[in-house]
Amino acid sequence: MLTDRFQSYVERHGLFSRDDRILLTVSGGVDSMVLLSLMASLGYRFGVAHCNFQLRGAESDEDEVIVAREAARYGVPCYNRRFDTAAEMERTGESMEMAARRLRYAWFDALSREHGYT
């Protein structure tokens, strides 16, 4: 079963323990939604962070809604943040990937410190 394989992998590689509070970053794509389900079904302590970079119009907004709904269904905290990525790219001259990476990593770091996530 997938949950058993996931649990075994986490333990074998020492990724985190049941005592850790994990900040799980969830895009709304299949892989991160499966990870959300696995973490919840195995009883890990975690919160969900979702970035809306506002680059795909309504699809970006739909992902935000889906992630928030699933986090609520599992009873875990959900933090959503919208970034004006296009304006940030214009301001800094960075590529879309670099601007989005810098924005999300800074936010994830701040969330982790503020809420005690590892």
What are these regions (language model features)?
Residues 1-118:
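Core alpha/beta nucleotide-donor-binding catalytic domains of modification enzymes
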